[in-house]
Design a protein with these regions (language model features):
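Short alpha-helix in the alpha/beta-hydrolase fold that links the catalytic acid
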Residues: 46, 143-146, 155, 169-177
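Short beta-strand/loop motif that positions the catalytic acidic residue
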Residues: 153-154, 159-161, 165
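Primarily recognizes the serine-hydrolase "nucleophile elbow" in alpha/beta-hydrolase
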Residues: 88-155
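Acidic catalytic loop of the alpha/beta-hydrolase fold
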Residues: 163-168, 195
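Serine-hydrolase catalytic machinery in alpha/beta-hydrolase-like enzymes
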Residues: 9-102, 197-198, 203
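Catalytic histidine neighborhood in serine/cysteine hydrolases
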Residues: 179-195
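Catalytic active-site module of serine/aspartate enzymes centered on a nucleophile-bearing elbow/loop
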Residues: 192, 200-225
Length: 225
């Protein structure tokens, strides 16, 4: 089941299902990247990040969480979240078993939240965390902040969020990632809501440049197409 439009290889290996973008030559790092509650691994934002990052030497696996593998539509159920985190771990292991270099993990919205919880439970899981539109709290309910696990994160974390995201303001998110016990960086996308995929936001390119600095990745002189 090739994804010829984006030159990615379909992957179905145990609990891992998705698409793998490989750079020319040996990867200098890898990223396991997953989707939000309403989508799957074909989401435009994930494809854009995978395309841009792989063009600079970073292998990217965009993968479906367990709840999406179980059914094509519908939101995840809170009781099934541990299974989604298991999928995150399996995706990281898949990449680690296939090449040298640091393995990063992350996701958009719910996917980023599950990735963050997975690394809070195991600081050796990945070398860095990417949070795209972290859902800090339900819209209009800042008192229900999802921050309890953040102090247990001990790896560098890059957070990217829009100024119009109802799930958390830039000020709230900066304060939240300040709880993380490692280096952090925050990218504020002016005018963006929860969806960061619009071309004008250049999310893939901006996150890449911040990531190579924060995570110490040597991408050499390759260029982003």
């Amino acid at each position: 089941m090739p994804d010829s439009t984006h030159e990615a290889a379909y992957v179905a290996d145990g609990g891992v299902r998705g698409f793998l973008h490989l750079p020319d030559g040996n990867p200098v790092a890898s990223l396991a990247l997953t989707h939000g509650a309403g989508g799957n691994c074909t989401a435009k934002l994930l494809v854009d990040v995978a395309t841009a990052w792989s063009a600079r030497g970073i292998a990217v696996l965009r993968f479906d969480l367990a709840f999406r593998q179980a059914r094509e539509s519908g939101p995840p159920h809170p009781s099934k979240a541990p299974g989604d985190r298991d999928t995150v771990r399996e995706a990281v292991t898949y990449l680690r078993d296939r090449g040298p270099g640091p393995v990063l993990v992350g996701g958009h919205s719910y996917g980023g939240r599950q990735a963050s919880m997975a690394v809070s439970e195991d600081s050796d899981l990945a070398a860095g965390l990417l949070l795209l539109s972290y859902p800090l709290h339900p819209p209009g309910k800042p008192e229900k902040a999802r921050t309890a696990h953040l102090p247990d994160i001990a790896i560098p974390t890059l957070s990217v969020s829009g100024t119009k995201d109802p799930f958390g303001t830039p000020t709230e998110l900066r304060e939240a990632i300040g709880l993380i016990q490692a280096g952090t960086s925050f990218i504020e996308i002016t005018g963006a809501g929860h969806d960061l995929s619009a071309h004008k936001h250049h999310t893939a390119e901006r996150s890449l440049e911040a990531a190579v600095t924060l995570f110490g990745i040597d991408v050499g002189t390759a260029t982003t197409e």
